[in-house]
C-alpha cells in the first residue's frame, strides 16, 4: 500500500466517523460530551443499569477507591485552576467525601402492618438528576454527589462552575473510568465540554430531569428557584458565627477556631465567619489564637484592607466580596496592604464592631472579624443577628450546658457544633456522615442518599399480617 492509498483509507475512516448517527462520544474524556442533549441521553441509558442494588454498590465502591486514590491530584488541580483554597485541605475534603458519604446502607424500606393488611414504602430513584456544583469545592462535591445520587439509583448530569470545569471534568472522568473498570455502566456521571451559565439555565427546565440539586452561592440558588419547574434541593450561603463564653476551654477554642476559619482558606460555607466572644476572656482568647498561626490586624490595617476585599457596601453594612480574594492565602491578602506575615500564617483576625462590613458579610477568605460582647446572652443574640437567617451553621465553645442549650435553640441552624471547629459538623473531626451539599434554603439539611429518592407506597389489603 503506497502513501496515496493510505491517505484515501484515512479520509474514508474520518468521513465515516463524521457521518455516524450515534450520539457524540465524550469529546475529551469519558462522560464529557459536546452537547447537553447527548450528555442527558447517555445518562438516561446508563441509569437503567442501576435497577440492581448490587450494581449500585459496585459503582459506589469503585467511586470510593478512585476518589481516594486521586484525591491529591484533584486537590492540586483545583487550586491550580481556581486559585482558591489549600491543597492539603482540599485533599482532606476529597478523602473525607470518598470515605464518609453514605451509600445504599442508609436506605431502608418501611413496612407497616395492621388489621387492614400490609403497606410497603420504598425508596425509588428520580432517574437522571441535574447537579450544579461550585468552584469552591469542585472535586469534593462531585465525589459526594456521585455517591449519594447513585446510591439512590440515579445517574447524574453535572453542571460545574465554569471556573472549575477542568478539575470537575477530570473528577467525572476518573470516577466513570473506575465504574466501568469494575463492570458498571458507562456514563453514570456526565457533563458538557464547555459548561456555562446557559447550560445550567437549560438544565433548570430540561425535559426528562425530575430533580435539580444546586450547591452554590445565593445567586445560583435564587436563579434556580426562579426558573426551574422541577423539584429543587438547594445548598446556599451562610455566615456561621462562633460564640465563646467565659466558661470555655480557651486553648481548645483558639485551636478549633483557627483551624475551622482557615480550613481551605474559609471557602466552605460552613466555616467560621465571625467570632463573638465575652469580654472577660476576649484578650486571652486572641492571645492564644496568635499562637495557632493566626495574625491579629490593627484597626488601621483592617481599614486599609476593607476596600480591597469589599465593594458596594449597602446601608446594612453588607458588601460585595471581590472574587480576586476569595479563598486566597492569608499571606497574599496581608501583602495587598503591604503587610508581611510569617509564611506559616493561616488566618488574619481583627476586632470589629457588630455592624462592621467584615462581620455582616460572608467573606469566604481567611479573615475573621472578632466582636466583644458583655455577656453570653448578648453573644447569642448577636450570633442570631449576624447569621442572618440562613439557618446554615453555627458553633459555641462553652462548658456550661445551659448556655449551649440556649444557643442551640436560638440559632436554629442545620448544623450546630459545640467545642470544636464547624467542619466537625461535616464529619471532618466529628461523628456523622460527610456531605458537601448542606441544603438550608430548601430545608433538607445535611444530605445523603435518603435526600435524593422518591417515596413510593405499595398496599396489599387484608393480607400478609401474620400475627
Swiss-Prot record:
Location relative to the cell: Bacterial microcompartment
Keyword field: Bacterial microcompartment, NAD, Oxidoreductase
Keyword Nuclease found: no
Enzyme Commission number, as recorded: 1.2.1.10
The organism's place on the tree of life at top rank: Bacteria
Coiled coil regions in record: none
Co-factor note (free text): Has a very strong preference for NAD(+) over NADP(+).
Pfam annotation, one family: Aldedh
InterPro entries: Acetald_propionald_DH-rel, Ald_DH/histidinol_DH, Ald_DH_C, Ald_DH_N, Aldehyde_DH_dom
Reaction catalyzed: acetaldehyde + NAD(+) + CoA = acetyl-CoA + NADH + H(+)
One GO-annotated biological process of the protein: ethanolamine catabolic process
One GO MF term: acetaldehyde dehydrogenase (acetylating) activity
Alphabetical list of SUPFAM superfamilies matching this protein: ALDH-like
Pathway in which this enzyme or protein is active: Amine and polyamine degradation; ethanolamine degradation
Subunit structure: Interacts with EutS, which targets it to the interior of the BMC.
Entries under PANTHER family matching the protein: ALDEHYDE DEHYDROGENASE-RELATED
Function: Acts as the second step in ethanolamine degradation by converting acetaldehyde into acetyl-CoA. May play a role in bacterial microcompartment (BMC) assembly or maintenance. Directly targeted to the BMC. Its heterologous expression in S.cerevisiae increases the level of acetylating acetaldehyde dehydrogenase activity.
Name this polypeptide is given: Acetaldehyde dehydrogenase (acetylating) EutE
Organism field: Escherichia coli (strain K12)
Source organism phylogeny: Bacteria, Pseudomonadati, Pseudomonadota, Gammaproteobacteria, Enterobacterales
